C-alpha cells in the first residue's frame, strides 16, 4: 500500500550503472513498490514479483527484451491497463533501471531467487505472542521457562516471541529473556531484527546492543536501526547511542529511493539528530533534495539552514522547489531560487513550481509573487495525464480556491484561464433525511467495494469514511449491504496486516512518511465503527502513532501533501491520531498511551486553526477528548461563527459551501453536543438536503493536484468522484446522527 511516496521521492543521485546489479539496483525497487501486492501474501492478477521462477515463467520479464516484458509495460505506461503501481508511477530513473536490467539479460542470481518456501509458523510461538498482546506476561514467561527455544521460534510474520517482547514489555523483562537464550539478531521474514523494533526506546536499544545486537543490520526494505531511530521526533539520544556503537550514517547507495538516516531526521524535523548525523559523516548531498523538502515541510528553519550550509547541488534545489512552493514558505522558496533552482522546470508529474504555489490551500501571495518575479511562466499548462487537472493553467488551478488575492494578482500579471467546463448537476427537489440516507448508502458501499481491488490500497475517501457512514446509518435503523460491509472490514484488516511489520519499524511508506498517521488513523476509526476487535494489526498502528507523536503533543503535519482537504489537515491528523489511540491503545502500556492522549488534547486546546477545515477538526478532536469543556465550547462558537447564510460551511473562506465541509462541521458539532433544536443545526441539515443529487450523491469539486492515476471506482462525478465520495460520507454521517424526532424533516423546492 504505497500511497504517496512518489511525491516526495527525488532524483537518484547516481546515474544508472553500466551493468545493473539485481540485488543492489532492482530488488529494492520491487520490494518497496511491488511485492506488497505481488508477493507471498497476495498475487494480484496472478503475478508474483518476489520469486524468480514466477516472474520469468509468466513472461513478466523476458530476458534481453524489455519490449516483450509485461512488467516493464505495466510500470512505464498504460497501454496494457492502468500504470503500476496504482498509487502512483515510480520515477523515470527507476523505470530506466528496470528496463536496462531486462535488456542486459535480466541477471537474477540464484541466491536471491526466493524459490524456497518459508517454514511454517510455530503455533506455540504464535500463542506466546498473543499472550503478550493480551497482557498475560506470567503465561508468556511460563512458556519461555518451559522451553527457551520458543523465544527464537517463528511467530507471526516470522517474528520471534522475543521480538514481540521488545514491543510489549520493558528492559527488565527483556534482560531475563536474553539470559534464557533469546537471540537479539534473529530475523523475521522481512529481515527485521529486534533492534529495529527497539530503536525508538533508549534503554531497550542499549540493552540489545550490550548483548551483541547488530547495529548495522538491514531489512529487506533497506532500513537499519539508525534509519528507524532517526524518524522518531525527539529521539536524538538513541541516534547518538547507535552512532557511538558504529552505526553507518550512510547505509544506502540510493538514499532518495531507499531513504537515509539524514532524510528521516529531517522528516521528523529533529535538528539535534540531523546535527549528530552530519557531524558523524552523513552525506548531505546524496540526501539533500528530499531532506530539504522534509525540513521545510516540518517548519524547522534550523534544519533548513543546516542543509543549506552544506552547498547542495543546484539540481537538489530544483527538484525540491515544487513541494517547497506548495508549503507557502517564502523564505525557503527564496533560498531555493537563490541557489539556482529552475523556476520553470516541470516535475515528473508535469507541473511547475508556480502551479504548486497556486494549488496550495495556504494561498500565499508572497510565494506566487516571488516565483513570477524570478521568471515563472504565468501561463504554463499542467501536462499531468492521469488526473482531472490535466491541461489546467496556473490561473485555472488558483481559481479552484475561489476568488482569492492570488487569483486577482495573477490576472493582473497576464495569467489566462481555459474556462474548464462545469459539471451538470441536478439536485433533488424533494428530500427527507430518510430518503437522503437511503439514496447515498448504496453508492458509498459500491465505491467502497470497487476501490481497494483497483487501487491495491485502502483510502480515507472511499473506504474509511464509507465504513463510518455505513455503520452510523445501520445504528440509526437504515438497511445496509451487510455482505459488502463485512467484506470491506476484511479488506481493510488485510491491508493493515501487510503493513504490520512496516509499522513496527515506525514507517507507513518507504520514504517521506509525513501522511501515514492520518491514513492509518482513519482506518482504525472506520474499523471501530464496524466494532472490529483489537489485534496485532491495530496494536501495530497504535505503536506507530505513538512513535510519531511530537514532544508537544501534536502529530505534526504541515501542508506537505497536495491533496486537500483530506491529506492537508493541520489539526485533523492530531485529532484522528488521538482518537485512534483512544479506541485501540494496547492494554500492556495503558498509562503511556493515556499520557499521549492527554498531551494531544492539551495541544488541540491551544492550537490555532488556519481555516474552516481546521476549525471543524478542532471541535471534533476536543469533543473526542472530552476533558476541556471551555475549550470545546469556544471552538464550537468559532465554527458556528463561520456558517454561511445558506446553512453550509466551506473549507476556505474564499470557497463556496460544500457537502464535505458542511457534513464534517455538523458531525463535529453533533459529537460536541450541539442541540438538534439549534437553528444552526437545522440550517445545516437543510443545506445538505437541498444539495444532494438525484442519484443520491453529493458533488464536491476536487482541488487536489493528483499524483495517483485516476480510475473509476463506481461513484458519480468522474475525476471529482473521490472527494465527492468523501463529501457524501460526511453528509451521510451528519444526517444519520439526526435525532429520531427529526427523521422526517423535509426539504421541498429550492
Question: What residues fall within each predicted segment?
Answer:
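Sec-dependent N-terminal signal peptides
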Residues: 3-12
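Ankyrin repeat structural motif
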Residues: 136-144, 170-178, 201-210, 234-244, ...
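Ankyrin repeat A-helix N-terminal signature
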Residues: 130-135, 164-170, 197-202, 228-235, ...
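Preference for long, amphipathic alpha-helical scaffolds in soluble/luminal domains
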Residues: 186, 251, 339, 344, ...
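Ankyrin-repeat inter-repeat connecting loop/turn
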Residues: 150-151, 184, 215, 249-251, ...
